């Protein structure tokens, strides 16, 4: 059995944890075994334990860092597996130097879209075209000739498609107030302060809506103070939701107001759930919604609207458009689920990943 090994020191919930499960599923579809080396207590462990053809090796974080630094010389069984693997997927840029000394081709998975340590990798997998373009400009600015640059490939995440397409039931009550939801960690880069400001603008304009913000994090108290100081009554902090699918089922619109969004897994999940979406013009959303251009007509045909990041007024305008235009809202919902199914399925990711691994040179 062909084995691909993923290595990470990340323990937090979020992008890397979710991506590891996605890679396990894609590799399984493509006929590979996936071995994941990660810290004890990592958020990804529970989900990975249920994936077929996935083998888990966990260590206390300090020991894992030591083993990576010493290239597992004191753990000969894993050292042998790393030497014989079809490929090594490195999920933290700072680990590239140590892991690149093994024989198999290594791929840095650029989850963050940032540029740190990219030049040390032989191969880089980017989640978006914007991230890839930034990296190539950075390599050129450093004077790296094309032959010296890492091989850069765009490999977006894939989504497990439902057995049948999900369609939101049409609103039976024409007077029902539209419900907008957003979710994520309460940190500055997620842009939820902009959503609160946009909620205040909608309230001032007497645009009927309720906004539910799911999440937790260091800025929770700050967001509540902002809501109180603005006197906003149409937005509520709901805490962390373990099962967002039930939240999607009760919502009418999904909003992703991030200042940084390397891909936006939650955006695709909302679209598959049958929600029209509004997202900031960040890396992932621009690829997902902007495939045919960034005009409202073009993005609505892919599932929603884009607006300039960090612009609450533009966000409020986009929300207002979907709230008032139920026909466009419904059409965007149908277009979005179709767009994800056609272009971002797990099968598409598996095919692309298999092609990358098959042509990679040892």
Spell out what each predicted region is.
Residues 6-14, 18-68, 145-148:
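N-terminal strand-loop element at the rim of the active site
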Residues 14-22, 178-201, 218-224, 313:
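A conserved mid-protein helix/loop that constitutes part of the nucleotide-sugar donor-binding site
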Residues 70-71, 89-95, 110:
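Short His-centered aromatic/hydrophobic patch
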Residues 122-154, 159-163:
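A short, active-site helix/loop in glycosyltransferases that binds the activated sugar's phosphate group
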Residues 224-239:
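Nucleotide-activated donor-binding/catalytic signature segment of Leloir-type glycosyltransferases, i.e.
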Residues 240, 259:
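Aromatic "clamp/platform" in nucleotide-sugar-dependent glycosyltransferases that forms part
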Residues 276-279, 286-290:
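Short hydrophobic beta-strand element within catalytic cores of glycosyltransferases
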Residues 290-312, 322-326:
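Conserved acidic donor-binding segment of nucleotide-sugar-dependent glycosyltransferases
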